[in-house]
Swiss-Prot record:
It catalyses: benzoin = 2 benzaldehyde. GO terms for molecular function: acetolactate synthase activity; benzoin aldolase activity; flavin adenine dinucleotide binding; magnesium ion binding; thiamine pyrophosphate binding. Signal peptide: none annotated. The lineage of its organism: Bacteria, Pseudomonadati, Pseudomonadota, Gammaproteobacteria, Pseudomonadales. One of its GO terms (biological process) is isoleucine biosynthetic process. Pfam families: TPP_enzyme_C (PF02775), TPP_enzyme_M (PF00205), TPP_enzyme_N (PF02776). PANTHER family: 2-HYDROXYACYL-COA LYASE 2 (PTHR18968:SF166), THIAMINE PYROPHOSPHATE ENZYMES (PTHR18968). This is Benzaldehyde lyase. It comes from Pseudomonas fluorescens. Keywords: Lyase, Thiamine pyrophosphate. Belongs to the TPP enzyme family. Its EC number is 4.1.2.38. The gene is bznB. InterPro entries: DHS-like_NAD/FAD-binding_dom, THDP-binding, Thiamin_PyroP_enz_cen_dom, Thiamin_PyroP_enz_TPP-bd_dom, TPP_enz, TPP_enzyme_TPP-bd.
Length: 563
């Protein structure tokens, strides 16, 4: 009779579910899990902060289309709260935090990290949260947590594992680890809904498709390409769906949904919008009609019925797996060649997107420092299908978005619908773990404000030999909020938004990473090329101008950047 700990049961169950990495930060509460990982050769990516581990699990899940698992000691629930919020708010990472907690017997004893109801804390920011009350329940509940995380709409779950439950030993023959059995296809759309959607799409004169995170998580690029080729409908995306555009011909790529801002002024407002996993919110101009016209018929496909018509009226709502819906649309259109010729409409879309880009380029001049638009162009020139780009910060990702839709990255990860900065380093760290397995590199493009949240993770990169390239757009400020102060209360009321900082590349070098400081297009391009050539973690500290305001920031505060 062999006796095993609860921690051993956790790891055996995760292995049976296909988990290949664990992200976390050690604590005595979860040492049995760490010991079992050592015995079973499960790599642990141990970060310098629990929040980074939580975001890394998400980045790994999003970049690798796998399950991300984070484990941390009792206090970690407080540190990882934002990571749970980020996932629940729409990034849809497939993640399971496994926090340890004080022993059940120690409740109300004022001992180390005991008596805190982690399940109650996590309930509002997770899909499902539960505390394991008996060691023999671990395999069943771990598998239940995994099914909850992987089922649509995807999101974080939390399984609280008390110290004594993990330390307790039971006969290994007394428990059975169940198999993980999931549907391989997800919920397909009702045939009647599919027919109605295709009928509306056929009649439209200026239809567009807008992709969101659920498309990038669940759809095959080949199916999307087949559907688009058959119907001739140009495709846009929000930030989370951007990577799906990489598989489309240039003539069908409208870019980011923000490009639709100027279409109405050109008498080219879409008359039908097919939203495939895109959700109403900040990325669509809320319900303003600036991007998704009120006059347009909207077909919205999402696995979460709560998202259908959240901020604008829609003509048809379909609750279904987005990837499965795209497959069904591709199959249906492949059997019907009688679709309108939309060559002129696609050409108009391409022209308007190019006009926006040219307008931004023409206004992007800076006498005293490198313009962030020009810095973003340098990044774009070095990005291809072998690179995943992670964007963080406010001004940084807004400037970067103006160029990324013109190239074809292997992946593009951003804040998600929550929109909080500071998540990028952890997300990129996890993405680089997944990308190493796929033979890709990851580049984090972040602001000097946002990188400060996790700057200690350069140590993690060096220890774990992760060749992440961290590009810091350094304007020595919390740029977006500084601009807000200047515009809202006056330039003489700027306070608490300056970051007259030191050497970020020096910090990275002190941890053992490669460090570069650049201040021109030429020096930046050379440094990035060198960093990509070297298979090492690197930091490129890019001195950029503060004054330029990206178009989307002006739109958000009610101004017209193209007036």
């Amino acid at each position: 009779m062999a006796m095993i700990t609860g921690g051993e049961l956790v790891v055996r169950t995760l292995i049976k579910a296909g988990v290949e990495h664990l992200f976390g930060l050690h604590g005595a509460h979860i040492d049995t899990i760490f010991q079992a990982c050592l015995d079973h050769d499960v790599p642990i990516i141990d970060t310098r902060h629990e929040a980074a581990a939580g975001h890394a699990a998400e980045g790994y899940a999003r970049a690798g289309a796998k399950l991300g698992v984070a484990g941390h000691g009792g206090r970690g629930i407080y540190q990882c709260g934002h990571a749970h919020c980020q996932r629940l708010a729409g990034s849809q990472g497939r993640c399971i935090p496994h926090p340890g907690s004080g022993a059940l017997r120690d409740d109300e004893t004022n001992t180390l990290q005991a008596g805190i109801d982690q399940v109650a804390m996590a309930a509002p920011i997770t899909k499902w949260a539960h505390r394991v009350m008996a060691t023999e329940h671990i395999p069943r509940l771990v598998m239940q947590a995994i099914r909850a995380a992987l089922s649509a709409p995807r999101g974080p779950v939390l399984l609280d594992l008390p110290w004594d439950i993990l330390m307790n030993q039971i006969d290994e023959d007394s428990v059975i680890i169940p198999d993980l059995v999931l549907s391989a296809h997800g919920a397909r759309p009702d045939p009647a809904d599919l027919d109605q959607a295709l009928a509306l799409l056929r009649k439209a004169e200026r239809p567009v498709i807008v992709l969101g995170s659920e498309a990038s998580r669940t759809a095959r690029k080949t199916a999307l390409s087949a559907f688009v080729a058959a119907t001739g409908v140009p495709v846009f995306a929000d930030y989370e769906g951007l990577s799906m555009l990489s598989g489309l011909p240039d003539a069908m790529r409208g870019g980011l949904v923000q490009n639709l801002y100027s279409f109405a002024k050109a008498d080219a407002a879409p008359d039908l919008v097919l939203m495939l996993g895109a959700r109403f919110g900040l990325n669509t101009g809320h319900g303003s009609g600036q991007l998704i016209p009120h006059s347009a018929q909207v077909i919205q496909v999402d696995p979460d019925a709560c998202e259908l018509g959240r901020l604008q009226g829609i003509a048809l709502g379909i609750v279904a797996d987005v990837g499965g819906t795209i497959e069904a649309l591709a199959q249906a259109t492949a059997q019907d060649a009688a679709w309108p010729d939309r060559g002129d409409w696609c050409a108009k879309v391409t022209d308007l997107a190019q006009e926006r880009y040219a307008s931004i380029a023409a206004k992007s001049s800076s006498e005293h420092a490198l313009h962030p638009f020009h810095a973003s162009q340098v990044i774009a020139k070095h990005v291809d299908a072998g690179v995943t780009v992670v964007a963080d910060g406010a001004l940084t990702y807004l400037w970067l978005s103006e160029v990324m839709s013109r190239v074809k990255p292997g992946g593009f990860l951003c804040h998600g619908y929550l929109g909080s900065m500071g998540v990028g380093f952890g997300t990129a760290l996890g993405a680089q773990v997944a990308d190493l397995e796929a033979g890709r590199r990851t580049i984090l493009v972040t602001g000097d404000g946002s990188v400060g949240y996790s700057i200690g993770e350069f140590d993690t990169l060096v220890r774990k030999q992760l060749p992440l390239i961290v590009i810091i757009m350094n304007n020595q400020s919390w740029g977006a909020t500084l601009h807000f102060q200047q515009l809202a209360v006056g330039p003489n009321r700027v306070t608490g938004t300056r970051l007259e900082n030191g050497s970020y590349h020096g910090v990275a070098a002190a941890f053992g990473a490669d460090g570069y400081h650049v201040d021109s297009v030429e020096s930046f391009s050379a440094a990035l090329a060198q960093a990509l050539a070297h298979n090492r973690p690197a930091c490129i500290n890019v001195a950029v101008a503060l004054d330029p305001i990206p178009p989307e920031e002006l739109i958000l505060i009610g101004m017209d950047p193209f007036a």
